[in-house]
Amino acid sequence: MGDKRYAIHCCAALAARLVLVAYSNFHDKNFNVSYTDVDYKVFTDAARHITEGNSPYDRDTYRYTPFIAMILIPNVIICQEFGKIVFSFFDILISILIRQILLGQKFNDKTSSFCSFLWLYNPLAMVISTRGNADSLAVFFVLLVAYYLQKDNYWLAGIVHGFSIHLRLYPLAFSLAMYLALRKSSGLIIVPNKKQVALVLSCVLSLLTWTSLSYYFYGYKFLYESLLYHLIRKDARHNFSVYFYMLYLSANNAPGIWQRAFTFLPQLILLIGLSFSYSSKRNLSFSMLTQAIVMVTYNPVMTSQYFFWFLSLLPVCLPRLKMSISRCVVLTSAWIIAQSIWLFAAYLLEFKGFNSFIYIWLAGLLFFIVNIKVLIDVMNSYHSTMDVEKSQ
């Protein structure tokens, strides 16, 4: 498949997203359940505060970098759907990046394009972005870091990585894997080489720059709402997390050390272990994929947009996964069914008033088990030394 044919696919996928953006406006006016993500309304309100000369953090529950609100100022002065269009456009850029990363790994154009289509035509990606969720921005910059590392541009990779951490905290978890991927096979872990110094220095400077700018304009409230809050948050609302019911039952109590350790240590141990297990440049994308699955699966809060974190990395690793089609179908079906069971239990609670908290928790346990099974099978099917196809 040539670049022109691929461009046609990108235009078609963007057009499909724009149709959904147009539909979202109709849906919100005619149905009780809103299509538009509640966070999108928060973004728009925060942008309106900026246009009025105030702080975006004057809007309750705005807990993001101020730059998202700045980007969405046209929501207020031009078109309310502007942000959804921007997020949809970044969806297309993500697909292009996936293709370029695979082409850079010497996979042929057919394989690279097919894998990128798994994101380009992914209905979940389409819906989440057109609902107005901003995670497509974070995902794009995470993949851009992987692209620059593959191109041996360590300074630029660090600069982008610093911004991606400022934009969303979760890319921070990939830092150790990136650092280890740049070490020499015969070098000591504790002695950094020039590549590692370039990556770390540029990342720290970039992160400090963006954070300092935000602090200069919005002070401590920026630090608390966009950074500190995410470290201490305790969300007792029902969500996919396996920890939901525990947090719900202890909502009125201050979290103890045991509770924090129970929810944080398993994730930390696995993230560090995966960083060392796949500590080579060749395996970096797969290390990031497995870490993203762990972060989402073990997170005290899990919502649908978090699936972006690993679904965007899966196509990059797909050519090195030796798994039968039947196994792929079984795992995908199990993942969707487990998620659907949880959604049904949540529906009974939200719209029928049925006390289904225990069923939501049990469904969350099932979803957790399915996610772990998917992770294990993906790891077992990965072949880092699998010969890539010759470029056509």
Language-model regions, residue ranges each:
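Luminal/periplasmic active-site loops of membrane-embedded glycosylation enzymes
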Residues: 49-51, 226-255, 259-266
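Multi-pass membrane glycosyltransferase architecture that uses lipid-linked
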Residues: 1-226, 258-392
